[in-house]
UniProtKB/Swiss-Prot annotation:
It is a peripheral membrane protein. The keyword Transit peptide applies. It comes from Homo sapiens. This is NADH dehydrogenase [ubiquinone] 1 beta subcomplex subunit 2, mitochondrial. GO terms for molecular function: NADH dehydrogenase (ubiquinone) activity. It holds the Pfam family NADH_B2.
């Protein structure tokens, strides 16, 4: 019997949740936290107005990016150009080049 009373209480709570969910979707209950208007006015085909802080930050991070790119290119250029050294042709053997031995005439 206690299982039935627990089941009935769950059904009651579920019914309340379902009813309150329907009311919220219909707009009858709940709290709206929106301001009601557009927070940022659109500026069609106009440049955004930047603050001095935004300009400073953008120039700082742009300079930092280019410093890092040029520093890495100067000190670790093999990362960009490839890190395998070009082989010295004077060390290649005739067999590697496909040249037959001299005693074969």
């Amino acid at each position: 019997m206690s299982a039935l009373t627990r089941l009935a209480s769950f059904a009651r709570v579920g019914g309340r949740l379902f009813r309150s969910g329907c009311a919220r979707t219909a707009g009858d209950g709940g709290v709206r936290h929106a301001g009601g208007g557009v927070h940022i006015e659109p500026r069609y085909r106009q440049f955004p107005q930047l603050t001095r802080s935004q300009v400073f930050q953008s120039e700082f991070f742009s300079g930092l990016m280019w410093f890092w790119i040029l520093w890495r290119f100067w000190h670790d250029s093999e990362e960009v150009l490839g890190h395998f050294p070009y082989p010295d042709p004077s060390q290649w053997t005739d067999e590697e080049l496909g040249i037959p031995p001299d005693d074969e005439d």
